[in-house]
């Protein structure tokens, strides 16, 4: 019969063997860790931090030539625009709107004049400008890793391509050694356009280095007269069909690329044409000769143009001026709240006197 000592030794050996088998199975069951090959570098940036935005707050037209559908709300609400969300409580939004009304009505006569609205529009536009300046500081730090206060085109190019998913160290090495970069045609086209824009933002004498102020102009052309001209040229280039560097009404209202497949799409296209026709004829074409020049479009696009702000103020008042006294009263602005804030306030008339 096996001795007690021999039995215990045998049991211990069996336990160690089973433990070894389980550990081996666990190792092979785990997925291979390839994250080092596929994972982006920790300092790679999101594409939205790298690319100039298509939408510019407080500017009437998008970078791609589309009308800014939120322009009225942006120049009326400024930084408070985010607070007026459609799903927020109507009573709270009504109170916020009443507070805004009292701020615009600086002479406290219970109505808003065109001059008062003009002053308010300029103030809210400046808020958007200051917001862009603060955001630019963060974006500039993202592309200025050595913190020397300047960003070269190559530094920006590396960050941009890294944001597209390419390995940042490999890109940097290839650019340093003047090696060919294998990127797709679409990315190359974007890169070429960005380089043109970079050159325009580079104040004389050009050195392809942007400081923080120049980088602000690169991202936000509305902050620089020179870059605003460049933006206008880009928009006209995209819309101008006969190459005369001017826009006719038919060129301006041309439908986006695509076919109309159903009634809903047709309605969208009808709205596109109607809105752009009105904007062209009533606002952009200043001398009403049926042609929009670069100079006219530049004046239209300039968010700090006081004459434009006054015209905008008059238009905003006209939308809600039901008693035709050329002023806005509280009841009117509450009734047309969706136009001014993007939020519809229900039962505005019933509550206006009890809350104000």
UniProtKB/Swiss-Prot annotation:
It comes from Gallus gallus (Chicken). The gene is SDF4. Residues 1-29 form the signal peptide. Keywords: Calcium, Glycoprotein, Golgi apparatus, Metal-binding, Repeat, Signal. CDD domains: EFh_CREC_cab45. Glycans are attached at residue 33. Ca(2+) 1 binds at residues 105, 107, 109, 111, 116. Belongs to the CREC family. GO terms for molecular function: calcium ion binding. Residues 92-127, 131-166, 227-262, 272-307, 308-343 form the EF-hand domain. Ca(2+) 4 binds at residues 285, 287, 289, 296. Ca(2+) 5 binds at residues 321, 323, 325, 327, 332. This is 45 kDa calcium-binding protein. May regulate calcium-dependent activities in the endoplasmic reticulum lumen or post-ER compartment. The keyword Lipid metabolism does not apply. Ca(2+) 3 binds at residues 240, 242, 244, 246, 251.
